Curated annotation (Swiss-Prot):
Residues 71-88 have a biased composition (Basic and acidic residues). ATP binds at residues 241-248. This is ATP-dependent RNA helicase MAK5. Residues 478-635 form the Helicase C-terminal domain. Keywords: ATP-binding, Helicase, Hydrolase, Nucleotide-binding, Nucleus, Ribosome biogenesis, RNA-binding, rRNA processing. It catalyses: ATP + H2O = ADP + phosphate + H(+). It comes from Candida albicans (strain SC5314 / ATCC MYA-2876). The keyword RNA-binding applies. InterPro entries: DEAD/DEAH_box_helicase_dom, Helicase_ATP-bd, Helicase_C-like, P-loop_NTPase, RNA-helicase_DEAD-box_CS. Residues 96-147 have a biased composition (Acidic residues). It is found in: Nucleus, Nucleolus. One of its GO terms (biological process) is rRNA processing.
Amino acid sequence: MAKQGKNKVSKPRKPPTLKQKLKKESKVVKAKDLQWKLVDIPDNLGDYEGFYGLEEIDGVDVQIVNGKAEFIVRDNGKVENKSKKEETNENGENNMDVEDNETPEVEDEKPTEQEEEEEEEEEEEEEEEEEEEEEEFAGFEDDENNQEDANTSERVSNNDKDDKLAESNDELNAVSFANLDLPLPDDNEINLPNWQEGDLGSSISAYTLYGLSQLDFKKPTPIQKETIPIALSGKDVIGKATTGSGKTLAYGIPILEKYIQSLNLIKQNNKDKKINHPTGIIFAPTRELAHQVVDHLNKLAKYSPLSTRGIVSITGGLSIQKQQRLLRHGPGIIVATPGRMLELVQGDSELAKRLASIDIIVLDEADRLLQDGHFDEFEKILELFGKNRPKSKSIEWKWQTLVFSATFSRDLFRKLDRHQKGKSSSLMGNDEIVQLLNEKLKFKDKKPTLVDANPKEIVSGQITEALVECGPTERDLYLYYFLLMYKGSTLVFANSIDSVKRLVPLLNNLNIPAFSIHSSMIQKQRLRALEKFKEASQKNEVAVLVASDVAARGLDIPNIDHVVHYHLPRSADVYIHRSGRTARAGKEGVSVMFCSPQEASGPLRKLRRLVAGNSNKESRLNMHNDVKLLPIEMDLVSQIKPRVEISSKLADASISSTATRKEDSWVKQAAEDLGLDDLSGLEDFEDDIIKKQRKRKEGKMLSKDETKALKYELKTLLANPIKKNTRKSYITSGLQNLAHQMVTGAHHDDVLGHEKVNALSDLKGSKNKNKKIEKKRISKKK
């Protein structure tokens, strides 16, 4: 029995857990023994708010024991010994055996049986305690062999991961050279005679031409034809063209060609296989425009050596950490808004040095970027790039600058409702434009090349402008009339966010799919609203996007048939860019203004003088004789008026109830934070204006029964069709033969007895349809 007691069978020794490993590998050190590092403060941060000599440390845990802080670090002594052994093995020193036999002797000594039993008992006790605390980890410790295999496989996989990460970092720094040896497209697949002629064809690579052919861009626009050869020669360019004229490709193609040239140089010089800086940075005034530019350039660069990671957008409203990772990957082209780019560059001096080596800087919609208040951030970015730009033979002393916009005029930015002293001109001379931009941008060339593709146009000649005269309270009525009569996708602009929020439920109540986009929405909400609008415009005959001026600049929303100015814009440049959302890529479109009598006498007259007059004021410039009045059929307006009134009441009630609910919840939350229970006397401290606003909102609110009754009444009205001529007793009587229209499919879907109408054809001044019908009818009788 005694022998059996001595020779007791011990449990198989379990591998140490993660907690045990960390406990063995960690040690407590004093604060002064830690390896502190000085914080590198960028030069552009000045005195860093008075903080000097800051130090930091990584990989240290802090534990509070009996009120004192203990600093815990991993013991890296074993790692250092291994590195020393590797060095001695490589050098082949004679005393290698002595060193090897000295240090491991203590570790390799076999412990006695008693020590082994004591260690095993201690480890078993620790493991039992840990199993009670962390039951979820018990399943990994069932089989010793499996655990050892898992540990070895983990080591191998970790080593493989490290190798793969190192390889991927090399690839990312070189902007993914997997496509460097991409074969050139076959010339037979490229059939673009208009792109391949003259200086333009000799300067564009086969990759870009193939991309243009796949996108079905068969002919360059005037601004593209004139600016691309100049930009490819390395000169600074100022491009002026109307909205929708293809300015994105006018600067996108030169940047892409410059990138391809850099790759060819790398292919020739095998010594240097890294592109440490982006080829170009494109600055856009709005986030939506920046994302749109990235989308357009990705479609073109899809068939070129530029990888999918090669073009990135850096804008506000999205994760800054993700954008920092994207910039570490070394993109070839960056599209950014000035605010977010300045934030990233100021906080990272290495990034500022890398980006300062760029070849091309582009200002898209430059008139907005150079306005007072908008240029400060961009000016700081240029200053940082100038300070950090390296002096090297391979990098030019100054980057190339490309500037594009539809408008260059101080007068266009002035408020239309303000009195202007003296007579103002709508356009600036070419010398004035160059001088103004040179003062702010400091071009590389002494005199940059200015290309004016449309010297006699501000609003595109493809846009037909129209006017609807209405009272201030009748805008909803005439907006519904326009959307009801003229099918298609419509973009409605309002001057205030409150108006945008009110119009969407008003139109939805009238069975018109409407979506909103404004500056109070976060970036993801804006992009989601744009996607929903695009889907609705493809599915339905009518789709409406109600927007503030955040959507006025640069956005290329496909197939916009009409632009409606629910409010007259505050300045002429806003009107130009709003109207430019339609009639893009050579198509035609309609721009309609709703104007009250008060606006017609002042702001409208100033707007027409700025937009339609040239600098000499001798003739019209926008190729339109005057703004045409939209034809309105008052008998139809009177029939739809009850619908709009009910829908307006429902929309106002929903908005008022939502606003009141938010205010009440905010007041209650503030009272809870302050520890107040009784809020009965709070109204005595409210301002008179706030009281009036609250009473106005409460007056618009409806009860549940009232809301149900109004919705039922509106549903009944929408079910009854509108009639062209209510006095007709038979469908074949009158000037319009309803039976014939229904058979031929020419009848209006929402108005009985009315033909299908098109806003563009109605405004172009075709012959009177009623007169034609009367003549045909008279000739038939004869």
